[in-house]
Amino acid sequence: MGGDHGHSHGDEGGSFYVHLIAGAAAGFAEHCGMYPIDTIKTHIQAIKPGAMQTSSLQITKHIIQQHGITGLFRGLTAVAAGAAPSHAVHFSIYELLKFKFIGSDEDHHPIKVGIAGAIATMTSEAVASPMDVVKQRLQLQITDYKGLTDCTKRIWVKEGIRGFYSGYTTTLVMNVPYNIVYFASYESLKKIIQPWFNNKNPEERSYQLIDHLVAGGGAGMLAAAFTNPFDVVKTRLQTQSDFIASSTINSAKSIKRYGGMMDAMKTIWIEEGMDGYLRGMKPRMVFHSMSSAIVWSVYEYFKFILGE
């Protein structure tokens, strides 16, 4: 992550708060900037088997026709509420563990970096999962929901605390390997890319935007492709409901059709084959490539200006 400006972890307390602030800023910028693509991806993955197949463009047109341009941003409040704290936790713990495992930014151990990212994920997802569930319910234009507060209240009343953690196990199963690939790829790509775009001595360099854009984008794309099947399962689990109907394309009365992660994986394979696991893969790769470029650029920038 931040080896570009020769920072030291001598003041671990100060560094920890820098990472909290930088992580929060990066998470907010990433999710707000990429939200429309995430909405489209969620619609694609939530389409029921046997329903008419639709493209990203068709879904985009349908959402705008039915709900206006704001339909692409429905649920954004939930993301804004959850992204900043979850990313703050994620990056601060990641940096702390990376330092404990490796010690110096000059050393490079992809496996240790990946493990640090995976452990950080387990903590941050506990913060992010409830808002992720609310976000996806709102993204699918569930007409019974009047907004963030109403959606949150009704999930609590109808489904209890378990409703906010629907797909949580799948999220962890997906995000642990995702973040192993993601963080290891980012750090590795950054080491490779730095000599290409910079002629200065690495010890004298400050913030270099191109490093983080390219390394972040590449890492996000690789990790997204690797874990797409788990993301499909997670989306199906989080968006199923036994008490409301959806107004999306191919709308149909929703029922709880998946008993859990393993049942969802089995059912998708039987009913849809490999194509089911690959739903939304292209927009997801685009989304994670662009969002990762944003998050790393903003994160490293805030670390730099905060003196890290």
UniProtKB/Swiss-Prot annotation:
A GO MF term: ferrous iron transmembrane transporter activity
Tagged with keyword Magnesium: no
Membrane topology: Multi-pass membrane protein
GO cellular component: mitochondrial inner membrane; mitochondrial membrane; mitochondrion
Compartments, as annotated in UniProt: Mitochondrion inner membrane
Major place of residence: mitochondrion
A Pfam family: Mito_carr
Ranges: Solcar repeats: 14-100, 108-192, 207-305
Cysteines engaged in disulfide bonds, as pairs: none
Family, per entry: Belongs to the mitochondrial carrier (TC 2.A.29) family.
Record function comment: Mitochondrial solute carriers shuttle metabolites, nucleotides, and cofactors through the mitochondrial inner membrane. Mitochondrial iron transporter that mediates iron uptake. Probably required for heme synthesis of hemoproteins and Fe-S cluster assembly.
Protein name: Mitoferrin
Organism: Dictyostelium discoideum (Social amoeba)
